[in-house]
Design a protein with these regions (language model features):
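Ligand-binding beta-strand-loop-alpha-helix segment within the catalytic cores
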Residues: 1, 163-211
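Metallocofactor- and cofactor-centric catalytic cores in central/energy metabolism, strongly enriched
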Residues: 1-152, 157-161, 166, 182-186, ...
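Gly/Pro-rich active-site capping loops and adjacent beta-alpha segments
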Residues: 201, 210-228
């Protein structure tokens, strides 16, 4: 087995949508939960400080407790940022309510992928999907499987998930990958991985940099360039 020494965390940086004057943080316009709650708890247990960025400020007692994702006891400092350019929902969108689960996008209007080698691979992979299973899609060509599932209208038979915590809906390709259209649920990222590690997936389609004839996979070293 591998032993990982406990890291000492001094500062945690998290963000949400609304924070009240007691520091309670909500995520109603966010497209993922990430690991904000676990990160804040870990930093506080190490005696560090947690700084939360939010878009809106509310008076204490005006936020419904069910919508609070990170309680104020885990937050030390708050930064209110109303600039959409530095508080984007994700890399591709300042704010899209369909990614946050606040409306349902009309998936029938989404353009189909052009017939390329990548789509052929995605279509072949989609043939391996089994009814009633949960699926994890990785970055790269695997993300096109979501478009194929939507195009073939078979999303009701499988549940697509992402490592960032989305459950259901249709995974988004491109710069907003990790988010999805019309999600059914948002899990914290660490909770999602608990489900994965426990064997909850029916299949996983993952991206890679290179592989060999024995199935060994390289996902981190891309020639002379550092990943990140």
């Amino acid at each position: 087995y591998l032993f990982y020494p406990k890291p000492v965390l001094n500062v945690g940086l998290i963000r949400g949508t609304t924070v009240d004057t007691h520091g309670n943080l909500t995520f109603e316009e966010e497209s993922i939960n990430s690991e904000a709650l676990s990160l804040a708890m870990a930093v506080k247990q190490c005696g560090g400080i947690v700084i939360a960025q939010a878009k809106y400020k509310a008076a204490a007692g005006t936020i419904h407790p069910r919508t609070v994702h990170v309680p104020g006891i885990f937050i030390d400092y708050v930064v209110i940022n109303e600039d959409i350019h530095t508080h984007q929902q994700n890399e591709a969108s300042a704010y899209n309510p369909a990614m946050a689960g606040n409306i349902k996008a009309d998936l029938a209007e989404f353009p189909k992928l052009p017939l390329t080698e990548a789509k052929v691979i995605a279509r072949r992979a989609a043939m391996e999907l089994k009814k009633g299973t949960s699926i994890n899609l990785g970055i790269g060509i695997p993300q096109n499987i979501a478009s194929v599932v939507n195009e073939e209208k078979c999303g009701k038979y499988v549940t697509l998930t992402s490592e960032s915590g989305t459950v259901g809906g249709v995974a988004i390709t491109g710069k907003a990958f990790g988010n999805c259209w019309n999600p059914e649920c948002f899990l914290d990222e660490d909770v999602q991985f608990t489900w994965y590690c426990g064997g909850g997936l029916g299949a996983a389609f993952l991206g890679l940099a290179e592989t060999d004839e024995r199935g060994n996979v390289n996902v981190s070293k891309f020639g002379p360039r550092f990943n990140g």
